């Protein structure tokens, strides 16, 4: 029995609230149950030095957690003077995931920065960030097109992500913190709208997972991502 009472293949309630902030070209508040992440997409008319004069743009991400987004307060990383390895890993994951849906040449010589700030954490912050940041990115690119700064949208697909794992011997979808902290296996899966895998990150905590367990988890991920893709579509059409 899951602590939340959900079925093994059941997502938490998911909400995507667009245009959540005033200034960013794209902004989305994404909610996976009690996990809430603010995703903003900012367009900058410059690219990294290694991309100058190459006729293409860049999409990157930054990730952070508010000091009291968890049960106990954590100092801001800026106060510590450096980012933690976990933060660097997550923001690179978000950037890689979103670039998988972008034609960088169509974007032109500019970059889009996705800032993903965790307001409240209850498991699955990186997968929520990817799912919400995609919608913010689409809104930013649509604005560029509306303003005539690009001729066509550089977005050629959809990207969403979800966590899966093995909790008390059972493969489950979309782990919250109570499950994640006790899971024998935890995996984050990034996929596109065609059912293709962009990234899988899986770790066994208690015992090594078997091939049949891996298959069960990826099948759950496919089910969950398909629902998230549809939620994104509905949000963008609203």
From Swiss-Prot:
CDD domains: RNase_PH_bact. Its EC number is 2.7.7.56. Keywords: Nucleotidyltransferase, RNA-binding, rRNA processing, Transferase, tRNA processing, tRNA-binding. Pfam families: RNase_PH, RNase_PH_C. Phosphorolytic 3'-5' exoribonuclease that plays an important role in tRNA 3'-end maturation. Removes nucleotide residues following the 3'-CCA terminus of tRNAs; can also add nucleotides to the ends of RNA molecules by using nucleoside diphosphates as substrates, but this may not be physiologically important. Probably plays a role in initiation of 16S rRNA degradation (leading to ribosome degradation) during starvation. The keyword RNA-binding applies. It catalyses: tRNA(n+1) + phosphate = tRNA(n) + a ribonucleoside 5'-diphosphate. It is an enzyme of class 2 (transferase). It comes from Alkalilimnicola ehrlichii (strain ATCC BAA-1101 / DSM 17681 / MLHE-1). The keyword rRNA processing applies. Phosphate binds at residues 86, 124-126. This is Ribonuclease PH. Belongs to the RNase PH family. One of its GO terms (biological process) is rRNA catabolic process. InterPro entries: ExoRNase_PH_dom1 (IPR001247), ExoRNase_PH_dom2 (IPR015847), ExoRNase_PH_dom2_sf (IPR036345), PNPase/RNase_PH_dom_sf (IPR027408), Ribosomal_Su5_D2-typ_SF (IPR020568), RNase_PH (IPR050080), RNase_PH_bac-type (IPR002381), RNase_PH_CS (IPR018336). GO terms for molecular function: 3'-5'-RNA exonuclease activity; tRNA binding; tRNA nucleotidyltransferase activity. Homohexameric ring arranged as a trimer of dimers.
């Amino acid at each position: 029995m899951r602590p939340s009472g959900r079925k093994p293949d059941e997502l938490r309630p998911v909400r995507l609230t667009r245009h959540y902030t005033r200034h960013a070209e794209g902004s989305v508040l994404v909610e996976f149950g009690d996990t809430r992440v603010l995703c903003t997409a900012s367009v900058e008319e410059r690219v990294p030095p290694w991309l100058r004069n190459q006729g293409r743009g860049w999409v990157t991400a930054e990730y952070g957690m508010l000091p009291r987004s968890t049960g106990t307060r954590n100092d801001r990383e800026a106060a510590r003077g450096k980012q933690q390895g976990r933060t660097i890993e997550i923001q690179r994951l978000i950037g890689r995931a979103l670039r998988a849906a972008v034609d960088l040449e169509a974007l032109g010589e500019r970059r889009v920065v996705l800032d993903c700030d965790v307001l409240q954490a209850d498991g699955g912050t990186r997968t929520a960030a990817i799912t919400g940041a995609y919608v913010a990115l689409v809104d930013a690119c649509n604005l560029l097109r509306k303003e005539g700064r690009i001729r066509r949208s550089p977005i050629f697909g959809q990207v969403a992500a979800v966590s899966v794992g093995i909790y008390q011997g059972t493969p489950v979808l979309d782990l919250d913190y109570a499950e994640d902290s006790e899971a024998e296996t935890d995996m984050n899966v990034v996929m596109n709208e065609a059912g293709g895998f962009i990234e899988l990150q899986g770790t066994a905590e208690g015992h090594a997972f078997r091939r049949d367990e891996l298959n069960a988890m990826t099948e759950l991920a496919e089910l969950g991502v398909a629902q998230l893709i549809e939620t994104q579509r509905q949000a963008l059409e609203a």
